[in-house]
Regions:
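Non-catalytic pre-domain segments flanking phosphatase-related domains
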Residues: 1-30
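Short, flexible loop segments at the rims of nucleotide/cofactor-binding pockets, characterized by
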Residues: 5-7, 12, 48-51, 96-97
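Amphipathic coiled-coil/heptad-repeat helices and related helical stalk/stem segments
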Residues: 11-14, 57, 101
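Asp-based phosphoryl-transfer active-site loop
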Residues: 23-40, 132
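Short coil/turn segments at beta-strand junctions that form active-site/ligand-binding loops
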Residues: 24-26, 69, 117-118
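A positional/architectural concept
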Residues: 36-66
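Mg2+-dependent phosphoryl-transfer enzymes with acidic/Ser/Thr/Gly-rich catalytic loops
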Residues: 47-54, 81, 88-89, 93-95, ...
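Substrate-recognition element of Asp-dependent hydrolases with the DxDx(T/V) motif
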Residues: 61-85, 95-96, 132
Length: 163
């Protein structure tokens, strides 16, 4: 009985700390493939790569922007589709073809006058692990790589934004 109370108390404390951390956020950085897409790529016979972005994610990004959060895309892959999606959403920062994600993220923070404490990152794969020291909140989708799921602060259980 006492152990159950302690567990509930700890979860309330963790939720309080998480809410406090969320209030400090000014920048949300999103990986693209596997976060804003399902991770699959279609390739045409001519070699063109096609990605599918979900409209609901776009709405969620716009709502976050309206709430005053700066949203940026950061991807290891170079993609015209990603850059077009960023333009459509009115994102000022779309970094593609990035080989060193922590350095690129730290540079973006400097440009915006922000610290890691004001930054959250959503990633899905092993190449997203190195950003951990430069963000306050590391998050991943439920189907992310297991090593990433083990170290994140939160796992997104669904791909849909809830109002």
């Amino acid at each position: 009985m006492n152990g159950g109370w302690l567990a509930r108390g700890r979860s309330r404390l963790a939720a309080w700390r998480c809410r406090a951390r969320l209030r400090q956020l000014k920048l949300l950085v999103l990986d693209v493939d596997g976060v804003l897409t399902d991770g699959g790529l279609w390739t045409t016979e001519s070699g063109e790569v096609i990605k599918r972005f979900d409209v609901r994610d776009g709405l969620g990004i716009r709502l976050l922007q309206q709430a005053g959060l700066e949203v940026a895309l950061l991807s290891g892959g170079k993609s015209g589709a990603t850059e077009q999606r960023a333009r459509y959403l009115g994102l000022q920062h779309c970094l593609t073809g990035v080989k060193d994600k922590p350095a690129a993220l730290a540079n973006l923070q400097r440009q915006l006058g922000l610290t890691p404490a004001a930054t959250a990152f959503v990633g899905d794969d092993l190449n997203d692990l190195p950003v951990r020291p430069v963000v306050a909140l590391l998050v991943c989708p439920a189907d992310a790589a297991a090593p990433l799921r083990r170290i994140v602060r939160a796992i997104l259980k669904t791909s849909e934004f809830a109002p």
